[in-house]
């Protein structure tokens, strides 16, 4: 069987969509479902389109790791140092030495615990209801509803956040987050299990409600994406039937991963700079508009 270049082109379009939408509050999964249906990418049998989406999401996650490598690596080192220093403090008589190490590594340990806490709620729900979510929520109808509901919530919650920010303190340093704030953000991340809601929109809204600045909420969203998406992707990759893979599929995976990675690198940098100057309202308006258009297309049976 020869290489299907048209299918590879469609796969690259999906990878571009993933890179453009993964880290902005518009729902990458919703857009991939929609675009995949429009260009007939999702019609291939054997579950490859679903597995392909998982792989290109890993490409997007790699972009976060690259851009925030200094913060990630230092936090991992401090997290482990804190644990070993705590053990050493209990086992050794040299308390001064280990108490100093504990103080030096406390920031990284606290950050690591916040990420773990923020990951737990969606991880539990995702594991318990993985098959049900895939079966009942992954459709253009649920995406249309998610677009609209998420857009309205973004407008309402951001307006309340901006009023609150004028009269009370908000957290502007990601290392000053509390465990309670990370838990609330993690609970909001559960909304992202509904395609169309958007993981970044859900966690940013949770950040606003918990008292985080937009920039801190967004950056914490990026860090939460690493364990959340790697875990979900690992589960999907484990379940895939690789016996049906062919050369076209393999080329699509490699190129799609690279394209999603490159596009995500650009988008993350631009998005953070945008948020430092302007509100999220434009994304919310786009979501509502896209949801209405999608609902009309479904109602008129242009797409199913």
Swiss-Prot record:
InterPro entries: UppP. One of its GO terms (cellular component) is plasma membrane. GO terms for molecular function: undecaprenyl-diphosphatase activity. Its main location: membrane. The keyword Hydrolase applies. It is a multi-pass membrane protein. It is found in: Cell membrane. Belongs to the UppP family. Catalyzes the dephosphorylation of undecaprenyl diphosphate (UPP). Confers resistance to bacitracin. This is Undecaprenyl-diphosphatase. It comes from Clostridium perfringens (strain SM101 / Type A). The gene is uppP.
């Amino acid at each position: 069987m020869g290489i299907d270049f048209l299918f590879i082109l469609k796969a690259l379009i999906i990878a571009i969509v993933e890179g453009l939408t993964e880290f902005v509050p518009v729902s990458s999964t919703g857009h991939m479902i929609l675009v995949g249906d429009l260009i007939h990418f999702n019609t291939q049998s054997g579950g490859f389109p679903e597995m392909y989406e998982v792989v290109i999401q890993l490409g997007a996650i790699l972009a976060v790791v690259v851009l925030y490598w200094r913060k990630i690596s230092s936090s991992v080192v401090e997290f482990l140092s804190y644990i070993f220093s705590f053990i050493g403090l209990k086992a050794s008589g040299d308390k001064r030495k280990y108490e100093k190490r504990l103080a030096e590594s406390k920031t990284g340990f606290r950050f690591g615990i916040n990420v773990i806490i923020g990951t737990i709620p969606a991880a539990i729900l995702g594991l318990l209801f993985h098959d049900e979510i895939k079966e009942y929520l992954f459709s253009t109808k649920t995406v249309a509803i998610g677009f609209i509901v998420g857009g309205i919530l973004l407008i309402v919650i951001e307006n309340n956040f901006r009023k609150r920010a004028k009269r009370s303190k908000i957290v502007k340093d990601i290392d000053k987050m509390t465990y309670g704030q990370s838990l609330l953000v993690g609970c909001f991340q559960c909304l992202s299990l509904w395609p169309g809601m958007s993981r970044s929109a859900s966690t940013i809204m949770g950040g606003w409600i918990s008292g985080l600045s937009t920039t801190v909420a967004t950056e914490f969203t990026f860090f939460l994406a690493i364990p959340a998406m790697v875990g979900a992707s690992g589960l999907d990759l484990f379940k895939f039937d690789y016996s049906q893979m062919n050369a076209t599929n393999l080329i699509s995976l490699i190129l799609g991963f690279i394209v999603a990675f490159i596009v995500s690198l650009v988008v993350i940098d631009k998005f953070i700079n945008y948020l430092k100057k302007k509100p999220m309202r434009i994304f919310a308006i786009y979501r509502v508009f896209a949801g209405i258009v999608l609902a009309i297309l479904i109602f008129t049976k242009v797409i199913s």
